[in-house]
Amino acid sequence: AETQAILNYNMRHPRFCRPSGWGATPAFTRRFNNPYREWIGAAIRADFWGYAAAGNPELAAEFAYRDACWTHTKNGIYAEMFVAAVISAAFCESDPEKLIRIGLSEIPANCRFAEAVRLSLQWKKEAPTWEQFMDKLDERYKNMHCVHAINNLQIVVMALLYGNSTIDRNCALAVMGGMDTDCTAATIGSITGILNPESHLAERLNDTIEPNFIGESVCSMKALAERTLAVHRKIRECAK
């Protein structure tokens, strides 16, 4: 979805000689030749907005919407808004179901994504184990693509509801749930890391990151955390 949206943007960028009204707009970039627009790509960009607007789920969801609307539509957007709100709320709330309901409060109640999350809360009451939960999910969404936002974020919700708030367990549940495992495990790991800040995870990891971003050849998790905290403080100051 992101690649196609960027291609769409470049195709209509005003640096080219184009007719009046030909500009690159979100309505065009997210839709034109983009069948991936309700997949999980926007949701996995949500983390930073939750960190930057820590403790303010409404603002986190707003940032997420602004980000997602260029590349995704409908449930692809709502998934990012939901995740950003949950991450933001996790700095102030630890109860999994309350976090999920906070996330739901930031998206349209009648969208398919919200319906799926509410269904997940119901399945938790009916299914004693995560395996039984997954049986219900697989049956309900057996014809949905394995990279769609709806079914994958239900796995994140499952890991949050059935996990024990440790990164190892919650990430393992997300991976065992299948589908887009690198995305779901990263999202639940992000949420769980906030809920369990004393996990000492950094002690077991190499702090060096070598990203593929232009201008960022080598960085560290510590440096990224410090930069993120600086953004949060700036946003908090501006919001006063």
Predicted regions and their residues:
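Structured, active/binding-site neighborhoods that engage oxygen-rich ligands
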Residues: A1-K240
